[in-house]
């Protein structure tokens, strides 16, 4: 664990910036995140952010711990890995310690750490988060929709694969490199997904929810050209279209629709009542496809940024 600095923003607060968390610090942050999610009904930090709490230092990632006395009352994670966009942040204040300026203190520290170039998520678009963004001088520029549909009575036509295409399950270890390459190509315009590394993939394979039987690979002549990775949220009874991608050059032949259908049928067969997915609101074509498949917007995550 390395400590970059500690600042004292007043009101009995201290903010420590770390390149990595100790196991004890990670557990304390996870407990804070779980309590905030219980109260808010929405995680304040993404899956990627939670995975980055453990495993030591990660390139471009910093953790900000806000304490009042000896009590951890706030957390922010700053990720500076995009070669073009401003650093991205997620932050949360413990529900029992809100309304005391802690969120503003964290936001101000994030702006100072990034030279006032910042993007910040407000998961679920809660009013307090929107107000904080306004106070910090950030403006809305991205909306990420979570869409859902019932799986009961799913009535989808038999998937029609393009000529010469076969589908099989992912084999851990064997398919890692090929999948990372196709994922990078399919999401070259989307650094959050396209920049996933072997370490990121290994993190996910180590999670309890990982099941290669629900990770579908489409091949033509032995080459990977597309995939649909599903995820089961067992506690919530929800199946997710986790990642769906088609390699450039293989798009436009109906492979994406076929892979979507295959994944949804798999989730239905698990007895799950609901399917969900995430899609950018400005991706009108994808939103239209999912609406035709019976999905409707459930909630929206908002991203704000500085104007510089």
Swiss-Prot record:
One of its GO terms (molecular function) is mycothiol synthase activity. It is an enzyme of class 2 (transferase). Coiled coil: none annotated. 1D-myo-inositol 2-(L-cysteinylamino)-2-deoxy-alpha-D-glucopyranoside binds at residues 47, 192, 231, 240, 278. It comes from the Bacteria. GO terms for biological process: mycothiol biosynthetic process. It holds the Pfam family Acetyltransf_7. PANTHER family: AMINOALKYLPHOSPHONATE N-ACETYLTRANSFERASE-RELATED-RELATED. Catalyzes the transfer of acetyl from acetyl-CoA to desacetylmycothiol (Cys-GlcN-Ins) to form mycothiol. Monomer. This is Mycothiol acetyltransferase. It comes from Streptomyces avermitilis (strain ATCC 31267 / DSM 46492 / JCM 5070 / NBRC 14893 / NCIMB 12804 / NRRL 8165 / MA-4680). The lineage of its organism: Bacteria, Bacillati, Actinomycetota, Actinomycetes, Kitasatosporales.
